[in-house]
Each structure stands twice: as structure tokens, then as C-alpha cells.
């Protein structure tokens, strides 16, 4: 009927504004549709990023309204704390049985992701939790899409592929502002960027969401019948996720910034690279550096096997003030 068509037009308008990139928009439709199948086949942890009023919270509210009791929210501490002692009550895990969409609010700057718990929550293996005062542990296979809304990304120290293949960063690039701010930004020439559009905020949008639920659900049912719940990656999400990984992976950062291919006669001695790495790490992280054995393992993974306590065909990039040391390092 006409009312449903009008609501569909409103939803389409919302999606086009919040996700101006068409490939990303399709990705997010598929992501929302996947919550309906009751099986976590994608095994992803999707992190919604973006500063200010960009539609993140409205998007989460809409999915929560659609799913009702099948959606839940958890405390960020569940993913940032160390594992609890075995046998203690874990009601925050027990309550996730049967959920289809689980969201959390942002970590504080510098909060470190507990990769083990994240893998448990996004994997296809059994989890177990015990409700408060319950005698028995509750075992279940996670069925939910795990998401987080944040301006601050987690610190992730893991370099293993099992962690990073699960993480997807979705940038919310639109901005919704008050009318007076819109006019200011317009005068500054900031309005009109298709990649990062700016719109006047709809102050009644949140009130419209309950009336959208029926049509939104119908769209997703039609969608999931086509996709089977599979969410195919899109370039924008993969690029953002790769940038995140490279920033977090200090090993890769160190190698990219400090080691370059040279002539066959060039070589990097183990002692030289260890000293250079220790200085670089302490400068950047103000902490005790990892063991030398970890450094050598990462170098073998990334630039190849050593021979005679050196890596041949590569050289260390020193800062300008270190150039004299470089000349005399051998």
C-alpha cells in the first residue's frame, strides 16, 4: 500500500545518506539481513567508526527495534578484560544465548582487545557461561553478529591471521548537523563532498524508527533469501580494515618503515637490527621491547630466512642524523 511505499522511500533515503558509497550500502544491507538466519556463518567482528552525528546509533537502534529480544548489548569490558577465573559466574556471556545481534559502546582510547574472547564470540564453537546463582554452566554456539560503535579503535597486539580475518571496520562518513551548523559549513564550502556528505539533522528521525520496523524487516527477509546470510566483502571495508591492521601491527610498521630491499651485497646483521628495533620500540611505545627471538621470527616471516646471522639483500633505513652510524655499522 501507499503508506508502506512511503516508508520504504524513507528507509532508502536514510540508507543512501548514511552510506553514500553504493558498495558499502549493499554490504550493510547484507550485514543486517544476516542477523535473521540464526547462524554466525560470516564469523566477523564489525566495528562501526566515525566521529560525531553520523548515523551509527540510529542504525543500531533500527536493528535492535527490528530484532527485539533477539538483540542485546554488552559491556565493552567483556572484550577488553582478561579471562575470568574458571567456574565463576559469567552472566554477561550466558545472556547471549540465542541472540542474533550484539552491540557495545566504544572502548576508551588505548583499551586492548582480548582476541581470545573475540574469537570465541565470532567463531562457530561452543561458548559457555553461567548465570548468577545458577548451578550449571550454559553451553551454546553463538548465533549473533558482534558489533561495536566507536570513535576510538581497540589496541590489537595480535599479528595472527585468525584475529585479523575476523575484523571489519566500517567507516560512517556522512555527517548530520543542526541547521545553523549546516549553513556555516556550506559557507565554508564543505557541503557537497560526495565521499563525506553533510546533511541537516532530522530531529524527528528517531521517532520514525518504530514505524519503519515492519517494512525494514520485509526488505531484509527478501534480501536474506537471496544471500543465504552471506556477507560479501566490499573494497571500502577491506581497505579500512587493512589500514587498521597495518597501524596496529607494530611489527609490520617497523619493517615497512625501517627495512628496504638493497643490493645482493647489502645485509642486515642480527645485532644491528636488534639494537635498532629496541631503540625504535622504546621511542614509540615507552615500554620494554619484545624478546629478540620474536623480532627474528617476524623478520623471517616477512623478509625471509637469515644465514650466517644476517639477512642478505636488505638494509636498515636510518634517520638522517644516524647516517654516519649507518656508514660504520658494518
Predicted regions and their residues:
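Positively charged interface segments
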Residues: 61, 65-91, 111-115, 129-136, ...
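Walker B catalytic acidic pair
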Residues: 106
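A eukaryotic nuclear recognition-module signature that targets compact all-alpha binding cores
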Residues: 247-262, 278
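Loop/turn-to-beta-strand initiation segments
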Residues: 98-101, 126, 142-146
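Short coil/turn segments at secondary-structure boundaries
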Residues: 26-31, 44-47, 131-135, 218-220, ...
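Phosphate-handling catalytic cores of nucleic-acid transaction enzymes
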Residues: 209-249
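Signature of the SF2 helicase/ATPase Hel1-core->accessory helical subdomain module
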Residues: 119-123, 169
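P-loop NTPase catalytic core of nucleic-acid-dependent motor ATPases
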Residues: 1-98, 168-170, 216, 220-225, ...
Amino acid at each position: 500500500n501507499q503508506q508502506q511505499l512511503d516508508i520504504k522511500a524513507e528507509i532508502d533515503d536514510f540508507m543512501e545518506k548514511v552510506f553514500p558509497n553504493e558498495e558499502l550500502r549493499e554490504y550493510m544491507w547484507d550485514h543486517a539481513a544476516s542477523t535473521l538466519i540464526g547462524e554466525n556463518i560470516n564469523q566477523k567482528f564489525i566495528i562501526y567508526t566515525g566521529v560525531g552525528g553520523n548515523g551509527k546509533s540510529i542504525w543500531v537502534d533500527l536493528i535492535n527495534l527490528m530484532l527485539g529480544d533477539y538483540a542485546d548489548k554488552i559491556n565493552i569490558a567483556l572484550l577488553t578484560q582478561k579471562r575470568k577465573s574458571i567456574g565463576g559466574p559469567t552472566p554477561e556471556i550466558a545472556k547471549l544465548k540465542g541472540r542474533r545481534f550484539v552491540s557495545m559502546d566504544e572502548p576508551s582510547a588505548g583499551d586492548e582487545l582480548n582476541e581470545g574472547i573475540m574469537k570465541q564470540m565470532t567463531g562457530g564453537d561452543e561458548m559457555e557461561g553461567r548465570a548468577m546463582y545458577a548451578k550449571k554452566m550454559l553451553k551454546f554456539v553463538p548465533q549473533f553478529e558482534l558489533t561495536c560503535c566507536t570513535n576510538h579503535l581497540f589496541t590489537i597486539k595480535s599479528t595472527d591471521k585468525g584475529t585479523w580475518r575476523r575484523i571489519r571496520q566500517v567507516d560512517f562518513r556522512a555527517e548530520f548537523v543542526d541547521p545553523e551548523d549546516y549553513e556555516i559549513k556550506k559557507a565554508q564550502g564543505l557541503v557537497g563532498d560526495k565521499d563525506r556528505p553533510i546533511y541537516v539533522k532530522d530531529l524527528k528521525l528517531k521517532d520514525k524508527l518504530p514505524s519503519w520496523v515492519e517494512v525494514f524487516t520485509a526488505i531484509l527477509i527478501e534480501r536474506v533469501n537471496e544471500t543465504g546470510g552471506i556477507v560479501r566483502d566490499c573494497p571500502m571495508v577491506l581497505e579500512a580494515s587493512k589500514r587498521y591492521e597495518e597501524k596496529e601491527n607494530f611489527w609490520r610498521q617497523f619493517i615497512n618503515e625501517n627495512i628496504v630491499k638493497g643490493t645482493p651485497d647489502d645485509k642486515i646483521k642480527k645485532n644491528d637490527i636488534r639494537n635498532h628495533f629496541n631503540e625504535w620500540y622504546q621511542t614509540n611505545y615507552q615500554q620494554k621491547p619484545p624478546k629478540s627471538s620474536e623480532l627474528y621470527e617476524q623478520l623471517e616471516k616477512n623478509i625471509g630466512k637469515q644465514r650466517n646471522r644476517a639477512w642478505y639483500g636488505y638494509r636498515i633505513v636510518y634517520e638522517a642524523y644516524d647516517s654516519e652510524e649507518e656508514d660504520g655499522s658494518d
